[in-house]
Amino acid sequence: MGKKLGIHAYGNVGRNVARIAKGFGMEIYAFDAFCPKEVIEKDGVKAVGSAEELYSTCDVVSLHIPATAETKNSINYALVNKMPKGGLLVNTARKEVINEAELIQLMEERTDLKYMTDIMPAANETFAAKFAGRYFSTPKKMGPRLPKPISTQVLPLPSRL
């Protein structure tokens, strides 16, 4: 494929994304402020020293950062604008890490950028109307749906055994 994939946060999900991407022949880079460089490189992934370096190096960036006070709105105009022409931002983290207003502004200015997310952003209607063909989202985190909370189904089990 010849593309460079950047993994922003090299936890369990990031590691598995790297493992799968290797099968597509992608060159894989990762940045994680809390994961030692040696751990990343042991997996055959190139560790970079900053988020800025990751975004400026990679054609595709896959987000896996947690939503914390420090990361809220951290994926912003300045950071995403570092991506090469034709860049794709994939958010499988939390929608709160994206500064939606700044991403909309950037995508208006840079018609080469694309954005995919597995959780519908608050500004979904704006993204969908303005960026058809460059934006995709699913309505919510996908996965099994239970009719009631798991705790109400599992906790009573011992009394029925």
Describe the residue ranges of each PLM region:
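Residues at the starts of beta-strands that form the adenosine-phosphate
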Residues: M26-E27
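C-terminal helix-to-coil terminal segments
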Residues: P121-L161
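Gly/Ala-rich phosphate-binding loop of Rossmann-like dinucleotide-binding domains
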Residues: A18, K22, M107
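Conserved acidic E/D residue at the C-terminus of a beta-strand in Rossmann-like folds
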Residues: D32
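Rossmann-like adenosine-cofactor binding region
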Residues: C35-A129
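Alpha-helical scaffold segments in soluble metabolic enzymes
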Residues: N12, N16, V60, E102, ...
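Glycine-rich NAD(P)-binding loop of Rossmann-like domains
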Residues: M1-N16, G44
